[in-house]
């Protein structure tokens, strides 16, 4: 049976807030059981990368414990066996911390309020 990645319950455009944890899932199936490889912007990922990304459970999970803006990328999981290949893509967005956004808005409001008095 060719390798396949179940996609019906998988979010293809996940979002995470800065410094929060996110896990992407790659529910692969096939006979023989497929080998799963993760990619970031087309480059294969090792089991643990320099920027904290960890591949777990024989490739079934990609775990980012403290997401940063630099983690916003296209991630792909590829399930492959002798009968075929299947891929699933995830376009991960990393959103700024709500507190940081509120502070920036307050600074902008103060800046324009002071500027309009002059």
Language-model features: locations:
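Immunoglobulin-superfamily
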Residues: 1-102, 118
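Low-complexity, disordered terminal segments
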Residues: 102-115
């Amino acid at each position: 049976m060719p390798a396949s990645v179940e996609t019906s319950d998988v979010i293809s455009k996940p979002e995470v807030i800065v410094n929060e944890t996110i896990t992407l899932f790659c529910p692969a199936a096939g006979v023989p059981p497929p080998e799963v490889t993760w990619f970031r912007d087309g480059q294969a990922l090792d089991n643990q990368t320099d920027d904290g990304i960890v591949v777990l459970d024989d490739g079934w999970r990609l775990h980012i414990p403290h997401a940063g803006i630099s983690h916003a990328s296209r991630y792909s999981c590829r399930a492959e066996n002798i009968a075929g290949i299947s891929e699933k893509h995830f376009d991960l967005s990393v959103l700024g911390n709500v507190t940081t956004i509120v502070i920036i808005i307050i600074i902008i409001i103060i800046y324009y309020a002071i500027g309009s008095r002059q």
